[in-house]
């Protein structure tokens, strides 16, 4: 019923004429209601009053669960309040159900939380920060909650996309990625300066991390323009070549901007010369593709 309230809110909120409100909800794979949660967006079967067809949903999966699936073990569903095991089910059966629903409906998202936290920036590990969940489309993995200074953080997405359909036109441009990273740095600074006080936690998080997400759009259009099948070896070669180029340029831009404008506070505290804690995010691009 609480999820249904959020479901109704997304229908009531819109961003002008661009797109209506949207939200994603995440629960851990050991939550007692995980089986019903998996079917949240399936339009048929179950109580229609407990469906939420306008929300996106994701499952937070620790390594422990995947080990249980691998070994065909029982999996304990725990109370969120005191972590007491309420009942046990087959991990493998639950995994099959998750995969089947994802194949049929496209969701839920899977967030491999232990892997995510192993891959966060080193200065965030040193600060004891932790990623607890993801965002609307599961491409953002930023820390939330109370940090070492006792401040509450709310993650902020500051995104932009390179158009790969025109990759051949800009691939040799020496500063295109750096220019976009400068643009994103200016955008996040504008948010920090102008956002209302009601967004204080988000402003604080953006100020400390300066995390941005440079992504891409038009990858399939690029392959079509080159007459390359999506699942071919050549598509994989282009994929690695393009993203290697973008990543290296984004990393270099972060260092350059740190020297010019100073490192972000999270990195600077540990002597790391990085303007951005996070630099890339491959987000869905439905709205900007039209």
Task: Identify the function of each model-found stretch.
Residues 18, 179-203, 207, 211, ...:
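Internal maturation/activation junctions in enzymes
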């Amino acid at each position: 019923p609480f999820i249904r309230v959020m479901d109704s809110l997304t229908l009531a909120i819109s961003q002008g004429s661009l797109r209506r409100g949207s939200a994603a909800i995440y629960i851990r794979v050991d939550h007692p209601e995980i089986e019903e949660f998996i079917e949240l967006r399936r339009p048929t079967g179950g109580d229609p009053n407990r469906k939420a067809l306008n929300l996106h949903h994701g499952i937070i999966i620790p390594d422990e669960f995947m080990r249980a699936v691998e070994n065909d073990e029982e999996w304990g569903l725990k109370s969120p309040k005191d972590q007491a095991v309420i009942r046990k089910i087959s991990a493998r059966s639950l995994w099959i159900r998750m995969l089947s629903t994802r194949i049929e409906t496209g969701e839920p998202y899977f967030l491999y939380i232990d892997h995510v936290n192993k891959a966060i920036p080193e200065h965030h590990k040193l600060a004891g920060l932790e990623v607890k969940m993801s965002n609307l489309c599961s491409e953002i993995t930023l820390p939330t909650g109370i940090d070492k200074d006792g401040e509450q953080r709310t993650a902020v997405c500051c995104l932009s996309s390179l158009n790969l359909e025109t990759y051949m036109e800009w691939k040799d441009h020496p500063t295109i990625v750096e220019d976009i990273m400068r643009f994103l740095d200016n955008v996040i600074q504008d948010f920090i300066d102008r956002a209302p006080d009601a967004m204080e936690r988000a402003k604080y998080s953006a100020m400390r991390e300066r995390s941005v997400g440079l992504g891409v759009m038009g990858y399939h259009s690029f392959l079509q323009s080159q007459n390359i099948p999506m699942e071919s070896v050549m598509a994989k070669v282009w994929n690695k070549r393009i993203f290697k180029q973008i990543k290296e340029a984004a990393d270099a831009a972060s260092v350059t901007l740190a020297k010019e404008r100073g490192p972000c506070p999270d990195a600077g505290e540990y002597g790391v010369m990085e303007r951005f804690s996070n630099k890339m995010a491959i987000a869905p691009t439905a709205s900007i593709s039209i």
